[in-house]
Amino acid sequence: MNTSSANSAIIHSGYDPKPDTKKALLNVKGNKIWHEIAPELGIPFKKTGSFVVAIGTDEFKKLFELFDRGIANGVPGLKILNRDELFKKEPLINPDATGALFAPTAAVIDPFTATLAAAENAKANGVEFLFETSFLDFIYENKKIIGIITNKGNFYSNWVINSAGLYSDEIAHKANTLLDVSIIPRKGEYIIFDSSKFFINNVLFPIPSENSKGCLISTTTHGNVMIGPNARLAKNKEDTETTKEGMEEIIKNAKKLIPSIDEKNSIATFAGVRSTPSTSEKDFIIEIPKNVYGLINLCGIESPGFASAPAIALYVIELLKDVGEKLEEKREFNPIRKPFVHFHLLSYKEREELIKKNPAYGRIVCRCEEVTEGEIIDAIHSPIPATTYDGIKRRTWLGTGRCQGAFDYPRVIKILARELNLPEEKITKKGIGSEIIFRKTKDY
């Protein structure tokens, strides 16, 4: 879930991609689908709309170019706001702002919960997941791919979908396809602010460049404000470290939109890595290779990849139909997923009733975000179990407040060890190699 969970968390409306590209087509379709499926899957989703803010006369003229591009892409409801209309929406905006392009269909989402929710729903409908399973090579028969070789054995299928993100180019080359592309890892760094110190209502963008939508300022589904990203060439595909220079760059650019931002109120930083294709078009690559049957490549799915994701799935279905695959809709498919209980969102009456049923919900483990032991146990025993500290954190939002886990860490380790029947030294932050406790200093 690397890039899928470390991004701007925006369901873009679709005004930015060049018309007549896969990005343009799938962004607009994907946006519409997200509005439909987010409630079904219990995904935190806020219909905020977004504003592209112009500073000065020259930038205001560029809003009309973006407006025309959005109309060509089929984005509904676009409107250019004058200065007064913009300040009524966001009074903290730079006084030099001259107007904005308003896109009402843009939204913010919790990207990790969205990814997890889709996976849990898939599992409920019969999909099997294999974790810590590494792809090694393809299995061929008569020049057709019929399966894959992994560290846990061989698996066979009529089709293999290469959706390996940052490594999708390497998978495609492993199959000896004619795809002439490399994934260039471009890092984007972000800063998260304390929700009690800094508040905006919407998503704010600067005028975009050819290569980036720029440094945004956005509300989140959890009430915090997030700023970023920048765009720097990553050291490698796993380079998610944040840098002093990157933080300074983000703050400087964000202050062009809201000058009153105070970096002292930041509580966390993170970075994600974009899967930027080396092709000149910079468009999504979604294809069945002409020289290799049985494989579908999804390469270069950078922004607006998350917003486009459900539409990409439908696009792949059409590719399969085009080559003669007879697909049947699963009649008993259940699109509904029950979301996790979030204690802090409940009314006092609902809290009392829940604690009566299960006293574990009455024991607060994370004070900042009011996450209870009951929620942690739910996450550990969920359809796709949380077996690490970060797994718990992502599902419950534990450890994301002002103290960044300083209070809850030892308590979560104890709960994980107890529920998984493991020694505390075996509990990890995010999987093998990230053990938190190395040894006991004494026995109790």
Residue ranges of model-derived segments:
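Flavin-dependent oxidoreductases
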Residues: 138-144, 149-243, 252, 261, ...
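Glycine-rich FAD pyrophosphate-binding loop
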Residues: 1-6
